[in-house]
């Protein structure tokens, strides 16, 4: 089998043709059925267009047809661009234009998105289009089915994902078949997945961790089960019902499950593997999950999209670590690391901004202008600047310190927001905490949001003054039932920062009004 993503599915097809590749909405789809469906869709796409498009957009949800559409895009031999139907149409249009998308593969979940895109001036041939949508429709023709997936070269772009850009314009990250081939070869060597495994699929298909779910499973002949939102309320029952053996999510999912009482000792006995990525993993979250899933090996994974899904792994062992956070572990074999100091020059010590070079590195952003400041040449190698500050651990792996842009100056004191978060979590009654910086009259104040028991602000501030310099103790405290999550189910720090700023401005306006009333 070749090393492409299509080749990984073909490997699963050879291992387990009549076992379910997918169980979505209660419907099992075997490897043979999904393969045949994807061949029909890919062939129909190529037959319906005069020339293969440079890229196909896949605006889909997580229903049974979504996965056939994604696989069909790969089978057609062109670049796949997963699109989130819930995103604003103007943003999706920017992605479509940046990636050179020439056709769409859609499912029923995409109908509102297609209508909104059409209103934005997008009119693209659309295959498997839901009824009533405004795009030019391509016919699904079984007679046009491909006999086999179209071949791809290692240097060909397998997929493009988009990350947020500092300009507000999404940045397109192309990932090649060579990138993914190296990645999955390492994972095949590290893990023992097989046809009897059942994988969770918590991530939306436009999030790169979904590629881990799908192609780890499909390369092993295993089954993928998309997790519906309502399942988190009764996760132990859902996991048991599905016979799930492999779990992968952001750490925020642990908070959701804890809140519904799903982390009781032994509550998740069927799990063999548990993976977390996308945000920092606290030791408390790891401990609680390990108690609920005592038969599972737990790993903390880390990696920006530019380095193909994940680039480090740390196998969890109980213990205390810096800022009470699980280390991110060692960088994958075959890669080089470089640390940069605050001045952007190579650092001499064991702490700095993590830069990585190697076979999982993207060729560069779709728009070369976005490369500026993100890549550097050092001793003949091209490195990606992750923007993450790390410290070397005793075992040679890496401890995550926080984002470069999450290090702020407060009253002349440099502070890591992650350090304030960690200190707040040690306060009795606090379950989770996130600190944000609020601009105030040319300087910055810190505001802290927390979940758990509504701890009085004075008590929380007193607790923090025992652990932190007085200058960096937050000025504002807000209790929430739950921290907001973004579309990738990570804690939405931008929303919290906007909320804190709005509340600070509202409070300031109220004080001004009171002073005016008193002076009258």
Segments (PLM) and residue ranges:
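Conserved AMP-binding
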Residues: 60-63, 84, 193, 203-207, ...
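Conserved pre-ATP/AMP-binding loop-to-beta segment of ANL
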Residues: 145-162, 169, 193-199, 205
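Conserved structural elements of the adenylate-forming
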Residues: 38-40, 154, 173-194, 201-202, ...
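AMP-binding/adenylate-forming domain of the ANL superfamily
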Residues: 1-160, 176, 282, 286, ...
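Conserved AMP-binding/adenylation subdomain of ANL enzymes
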Residues: 171-198, 206-245
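AMP-dependent adenylate-forming
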Residues: 4-6, 104-117, 124-150, 180, ...
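Gly/Ser/Thr-rich phosphate-binding loop
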Residues: 219-222, 248, 258-325, 336
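ATP-dependent adenylate-forming carboxylate-activation enzymes
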Residues: 60-64, 81-96, 108-111, 132, ...
